């Protein structure tokens, strides 16, 4: 019987792919990571150790899967939509001595928190305000075509502490096109700064742990890849719902090269755009001639919280879409979701007496 962290002899990954006649599908943006040294590096940077539980998204032929099992994970659940990969993954599961479970599902439609919901042996939950992280991980070498919608889905779940994040600040390690990875981690005033920069950095601390050359993949993509590790923040940096902040960020970054006021006005009907956008900028003390990439997290927090107040004052405003010329607040105010989603409320953090440990948005540095 294999030891807890050692797999029995297996065919080399290239031979494995040839054995099962696996070819990457361009339509699914599939690229196989062939170098086991790199897959082991991903598992190492994800900080997988013995006894940990792991969910892997999109294992494909199982390169990272092997590395996770070698690292000593006591349970590994893989989520794979492509039925061609199920037989080779079953081969790995048989070699893994009952540590590996296969879920033949679409990751975008899978609530990964349900995978362990009824597992009484899962690692203990850890309070969100605790400095320790749960002995759980989510890892994935994502197809490029689902990477952005999937990370938004997971960041939203983090913000509501649902899914696997009901168990605590479960870290997330994923691969992205290098340009997307840079956007996720982009500091203020960088050309790579975007909506996804704010959405990731307000609820987590993303860090690009290393880059992978496109030459390491088969077939070779036209871009390099960045591996990003996300550690959820103990306290989000914005006090609104995920949806309110996302809408503000989407509109503000819509005109990246224009003054911030131009994007902000698209949040409002034409008859209110000047009044409400001016009021919001004045309240937030933001120069209307600045650009979106020069706004920090604290300023986006002010904008989102101010816009949330306006949406409560003007029912239906949250549902307003400037591209729909038929939208009017009177009709929208009668819709079931006329008011914005409420701010998530969680147990307060333990009181900190030390002045040195006082948390402040002003101390935030996204670089």
Curated annotation (Swiss-Prot):
EC number in record: 2.1.1.-
Name under which the protein is recorded: Dimethyladenosine transferase 1, mitochondrial
Entry keywords, A to Z: Methyltransferase, Mitochondrion, RNA-binding, rRNA processing, S-adenosyl-L-methionine, Transcription, Transcription regulation, Transferase, Transit peptide
Species this chain originates from: Caenorhabditis elegans
Matching Gene3D superfamilies: Ribosomal RNA adenine dimethylase-like, domain 2, Vaccinia Virus protein VP39
A GO CC term assigned to this protein in UniProt: mitochondrial matrix
Entry's Gene Ontology BP terms: rRNA methylation; transcription initiation at mitochondrial promoter
Lineage top rank: taxon: Eukaryota
Protein family membership: Belongs to the class I-like SAM-binding methyltransferase superfamily. rRNA adenine N(6)-methyltransferase family. KsgA subfamily.
Transit peptide endpoints, chain numbering: 1-16
Purpose: Probable S-adenosyl-L-methionine-dependent methyltransferase which specifically dimethylates mitochondrial 12S rRNA at the conserved stem loop. Also required for basal transcription of mitochondrial DNA. Stimulates transcription independently of the methyltransferase activity.
GO terms assigned for molecular function: mitochondrial transcription factor activity; RNA binding; rRNA (adenine-N6,N6-)-dimethyltransferase activity
SUPFAM superfamilies from the UniProt entry: S-adenosyl-L-methionine-dependent methyltransferases
Residues reported to bind S-adenosyl-L-methionine: 30-33, 58, 80, 106, 141
Transmembrane segments: none
Keyword S-adenosyl-L-methionine: yes
Alphabetical list of NCBIfam families matching this protein: ksgA
Signal sequence region: none
One Pfam family, short name: RrnaAD
Major localization class: mitochondrion
PROSITE patterns attached to this UniProt entry: RRNA_A_DIMETH, SAM_RNA_A_N6_MT
């Amino acid at each position: 019987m294999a030891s807890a962290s050692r797999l029995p002899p297996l065919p080399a990954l290239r031979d494995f792919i040839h054995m099962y006649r696996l070819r990457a599908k361009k339509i699914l943006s599939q690229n196989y990571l062939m170098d086991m040294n790199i897959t082991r590096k991903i598992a190492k940077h994800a900080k997988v150790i013995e006894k940990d539980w792991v969910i892997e998204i999109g294992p494909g032929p199982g390169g990272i899967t092997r590395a996770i099992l070698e690292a000593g994970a006591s349970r590994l659940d893989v989520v794979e939509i492509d039925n061609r990969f199920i037989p080779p993954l079953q081969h790995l599961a048989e070699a893994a001595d009952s540590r590996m479970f296969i879920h033949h599902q679409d990751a975008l439609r899978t609530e990964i928190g349900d995978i362990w919901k009824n597992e009484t042996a899962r690692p203990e939950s850890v309070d969100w305000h605790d400095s320790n992280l749960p002995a759980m991980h989510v890892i994935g070498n994502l197809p490029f075509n689902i990477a952005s919608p999937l990370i938004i889905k997971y960041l939203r779940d983090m913000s509501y502490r649902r899914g696997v994040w009901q168990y605590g600040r479960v870290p997330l390690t994923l691969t992205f096109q290098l340009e997307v990875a840079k956007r996720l981690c982009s500091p203020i005033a960088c050309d790579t700064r975007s909506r996804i920069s704010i959405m990731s950095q307000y609820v987590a601390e993303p860090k690009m742990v290393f880059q992978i050359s496109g030459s390491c993949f088969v077939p070779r993509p036209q871009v390099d890849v960045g591996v990003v590790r996300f550690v959820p923040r103990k306290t989000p940096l914005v006090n609104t719902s995920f949806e309110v902040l996302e809408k503000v960020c989407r509109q503000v970054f819509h005109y990246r090269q224009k003054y911030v006021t131009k994007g902000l006005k698209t949040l409002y009907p034409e008859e209110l755009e000047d009044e409400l956008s001016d009021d919001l900028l004045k309240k937030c003390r933001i120069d209307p001639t600045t650009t979106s990439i020069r706004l920090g997290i604290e300023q986006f927090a002010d904008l989102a919280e101010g816009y949330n107040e306006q949406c409560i004052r003007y029912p239906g405003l949250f549902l307003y879409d400037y591209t729909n010329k038929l939208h009017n607040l009177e009709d929208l105010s009668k819709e079931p979701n006329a008011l914005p989603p409420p701010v998530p409320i969680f147990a307060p953090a333990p009181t900190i007496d030390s002045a040195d440990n006082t948390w402040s948005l002003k101390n935030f540095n996204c670089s």
